[in-house]
Amino acid sequence: LALTNFSLRADNSSALNGYSPGNQLSKIDGLELLNLWGKQPKVVQNLFTLIDTALSQSKKCTYANVARDQKVQEFCKRNNIRHLGGPMLGCVTQNGVKVWVRTVRPATVKVKIKMKGSSKIFGPVESSEKSDLVASVQVDGLKPGKSYSYEVLIDGEPIPIHVKTSITTLPVDQKIRIAFGTCPHRWGLGNQKQADRILKHKPSALLMYGDLGSQDKNEHVGKHRSDYQIRDLFPAWQSLSGSIPTFTSWDDHDYFDNDRSGIPKNFTNKDRLAVRKVFSQAWNNPSVGFNDDRGGIFFRTRLGPCDVIMLDNRYFRTGEKRGFLGNGQTEWLKEQLLDCKGEFIIITCGTMWTDHISKGKDSWGKFDPEGREELFQFIEKNRIPGVLLLSGDRHGACGFRIPRPSGHTFYEFEAATLGGRSGPASGAMKHPDALYAFGSTYAFGELNVDASLPDPEVKYRLIHESGKVLYELSLKRSELTPPA
């Protein structure tokens, strides 16, 4: 599927067809969103229109409707289109990665890794209507810290990939770079300048944990899927996800709508399960919450010297004590914290850890300050070292020290700037514990970890899409270890 690569200035309103990155962009949909960063080729526009029509027939539509839609299938056959999304990398280790692909119809998917003088085939994995036409192929047996070119084969034929992509395994040494951020709100995933900047920094992984690829579609899972289709047609997202392994969790806008959580009023548990299924199939994560009826979107993984725990603050929320994460996820989190062996532990939450922005609106401060205190005391009592708190939701970017009665200080870093939106985070410097505050700018967070030092160190940086470092702070592991 030939896609034109656009590289327009994200901070120039003309690059966004007259829109500014604010509430206006939250309301646009369909072709208007697809063409936001520049007019897509006619074949891409027509393909999306056909898929969107197939997915809009009812609130329960899946990619089975696409696979069975005669107009979609005839169009794809006529234009030699065999995949609708991907390749998207995830679940990276020192020896391998998973490659996610969405096909046009049920198909056999393989991945060919090119090595010196030879190649190796991984798979096959079958995409099906049940899997939402997704196949995730496990690639393993690779060497640590090496880059490999690759091809995706669908029914034995390589698909054209019109952006530069490669697989890079995790390094074996104790140094790693991890990019992160939240709130692209769909359109930020089309920002080629920002994608190019992240790619230039060559992070081993990208963590995104809220307000990502679907926007306020409530229980209409067909429209959720249509939003993800736009994501997969953005050249910027193709170039980023085809080379940088991505790990994701969600927040309110991916979930149902603004500030919604638990089972929202006038909706059902069946609706909640359906939305969870869309999210879990649309991303390439190592796991998704509990592997039973309890559900959720959370997991733990290891990236070099770092344990990464990505939390779900939406699915289980009740407004009661321990109701922010739910009892089950809270106990799971404690078990994971005690089991972590990395020099640093990165914990992501889709909303703010502190109450300093909007008085804790839609976050721990309003819903579960007791649960937050229980968690902080647990970390302190067990002297769990190296904990870093990453947050999102409040548009803009801000950071805080969190001084504790124990004498320990937690650090919170937020980079809710992947969509360039203005928001309350830009006013954070009014608080005495604030570290930085920015708004109305495209930027991403970055953690540079060096665990080879006698006292391992992490350097946080907030990086503008232009490459300018807006803020940086270095912390020793000893500074992130609660006192005895």
Where are these regions (language model features)?
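Metal-dependent phosphoester/phosphodiester hydrolase catalytic core
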Residues: L1-A484
